[in-house]
Amino acid sequence: MNAIGPALSLFDPTPAVAARSPDPLRDLPETDNSPGAPERLLRINAEMRARPWPAPYDATRHVIRFGDARDLSWIPSESVHLVVTSPPYFNLKPYESEASGRQLGRIGDYEAFLGELDKAWSECARVLVPGGRICCVIGDVLVPRRAGGRHWVLPLPADIQVRSRRVGLDNLTPILWFKIANRTNEAGGGSAGFYGKPYQPGAVIKNDHEHILMLRKPGGYRQTSMVQKALSMMQRDEMDAWMRPVWSDIRGASLRQGHPAPYPVELAERLIRMFSFAGDLVLDPFAGSGSTAVAAVRTGRNSISVEIENSYIGMARGRVLKEIANVARCGVQAATAHLTVER
């Protein structure tokens, strides 16, 4: 496997000093407490969404690496600002077989599966900067009646929340993402009949939601430049809609992408914009088809994607390159992006 090499520059969590600011950044307030600072920052943010960003925020770097989420030793400690990921489902999704010996989603024992996930969360906690967080998109595991003689649910999100405390992470209020479920896979190949008979005693509540867990590494708030704040702010309508515990305006991703458990780029994009700044480094240790990396390109963040299935690396590469070309054509925000693939 190649060393991380030139991509090592991604891992400096200290914001670079921006070049001389073009309009409209000339009107930046000196501090958050300057007269009219919030209004000025919001106005600048709205204008900069349609303009090229200043250096160094005008260029991003993205690394897709063949590797295991349980071993991120090649990433320096406290170098990642945000983790956005969706770990494999326990023993239900049809993941590829080439990495079956290491693929978490193919572990047959639930407690052993949780133990292996703990190793990944421990590595994420190590590489996160103090105060950084993990946004984990995960759903309950539905076990169909024909698989075990009875219908039951493994509360995977709740188990992750409880066990994350063992690796030093704090739980924050999660988001309930209401979506249209991909029933065939999530129910182990089921159909509408999986949900039970139409009369009440045999009914089963439809599973059309996932949890977005918020796991935070203890630490204070980061000091960032006023330029970063201006480029990264949410507008008031976005804040009103996004900072709620239930989301219902983003649909689940199509399985036609070629991955058994994709999640939409719009979901990753929103989480990145909510919990990171322009120029930050975002990690996805379970990269899959590359939705987090695509969202990072789109939002002017750097990214590292780690994936254990070779076939998904090619898929992620194609999607990221397509997004890089699209962003370059638009000529706004971080219009220059570079991709490195390491196997």
Model feature map: region roles:
Residues 314-343:
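PRPP-dependent phosphoribosyltransferase catalytic core
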